């Protein structure tokens, strides 16, 4: 079987980033709102593209969001969504 046909596993192994992501997202969200942007649209734009221009420099939000890897942020967002919708592990 070709190795491209097999499911690969992805594991960070570090659950300590959950609080870091939560704090970061709150701060970035507030900065985006204060500047009059739609926070969800701007954060999604950044996470999909990796372009920090989606996040303003206001309140140091741009440098804060770049402290964490985008895949770490996405992982925590997916985990929170699944937990809030009672999907998966309980």
UniProtKB/Swiss-Prot annotation:
It holds the Pfam family IreB. It comes from the Bacteria. InterPro entries: IreB (IPR009309). PANTHER family: UPF0297 PROTEIN YRZL. Belongs to the UPF0297 family. HAMAP family: UPF0297. This is UPF0297 protein lmo1503. It comes from Listeria monocytogenes serovar 1/2a (strain ATCC BAA-679 / EGD-e).
């Amino acid at each position: 079987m070709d190795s491209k046909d097999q499911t690969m596993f992805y594991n960070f192994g570090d659950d300590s980033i959950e609080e870091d992501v939560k704090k970061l997202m709150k701060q970035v969200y507030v900065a985006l709102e204060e500047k009059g942007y739609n926070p969800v649209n701007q954060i999604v734009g950044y996470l999909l593209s990796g372009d920090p221009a989606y996040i303003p420099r206001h309140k140091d939000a741009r440098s804060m969001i770049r402290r964490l890897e985008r895949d770490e942020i996405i992982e925590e967002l997916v985990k929170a969504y699944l937990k809030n919708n009672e999907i998966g592990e309980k």
